[in-house]
Amino acid sequence: MLRFSLSIESRILPSFSSLRSLSPSLFFSSSRNNFVFCGKEISGETRNFSAMSACRDHRHPQDCSFLGGESFFRNILATMETVYMNKNPTAKAILDLVRSVDDDCIYYDHFAFRTFGVNGHGIDSMAKVFLDFGYVQREELRFPAKKLKAFWFSPPKVPLTANAGSGVNGPLPRIFISELLVDQMSPEAQKIVRKYTELSGNGSMHAAVASALGCLTWEKPTYSEFQQLAKESEYAAWTLVNGYALNHVTISVHRLKSHLANIKNLNQFIEENGFKLNSEGGVLKVSPDGLLLQSSTVANLTSFEFADGISESIPCSYIEFAERLILPQFKNLPEDKVEEFHRRDGFEVGNADKIFESTSMDQLTRNAA
């Protein structure tokens, strides 16, 4: 693995087990299947979130029990965002830069997470908190070459007040959760992944807590194990050392108020300010229907101390940008009448496959050049 000189100091991701000494007021196991986080009890019971059973009523997502819990749920998102910002200075710098031009108003298109599809640590483990707060599971996406699958989740319909904020206090973001199909990996890679997920115990039941606290639910791996996984799957290596951390947030470009509401203008603006974008398949990723336009930076690097005492640079997270164009049947609507449901929804395999490369060593090497 290439060694990188670090210009950025970043906190080392702690192990979940190292947090046992924290105050019970933050995290207290009240029963086998429930825990209290930030003063709220969350069910941890095991569920089967298959494509059919995970879905709430698609026709009435606003009927899900969300009212009364909205403040708590937004606090969960905010703590995930804070951990993400603290570890990814490029993302924070770009968000601050865009806010300075766009009257401090940024909305998120989606949040994304990575998981291991084994021992209960896959998509279901991270999806639970979102399903519990009214999100609806939507389409599955498959990435055969990368041995990945993903689902995206649409947010509940929550009316916004006139003084609604931006970021996590604005319209709720979509959620994109992917998982590595561990059973398709080599026996050697499977052994490493299973070793650490099994050591996690019930950690998978508290994926959202781990993400909000910025910690792993398993012990730190050795550097040699990280290297071995990276040779076969950079996604696997990333997940081994980052766990349930927020992989990226995505700015909703068309919701910006300035000239940056066009993704080509935004890309140019970002590059002119010294930030490099993921060039896999071209900087701008366009869906076959031409209605979903995406781009992203490459991941920040951070120093990570492995279990054997070796400190190395590892990829952290990145920031994405998405512009959703108006669907053909609504193209004649007056601009002030266009709402989010009039625009292209969902995700595109071809786009997402290239966005995944934002944490690849190839892109990091190009970025360092």
For the regions a protein language model found, what residue spans apply to each?
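Extended, well-ordered protein cores
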Residues: 2-5, 20, 27-127, 132-369
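Class II aminoacyl-tRNA synthetase catalytic cores and aaRS-like
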Residues: 6-8, 13-19
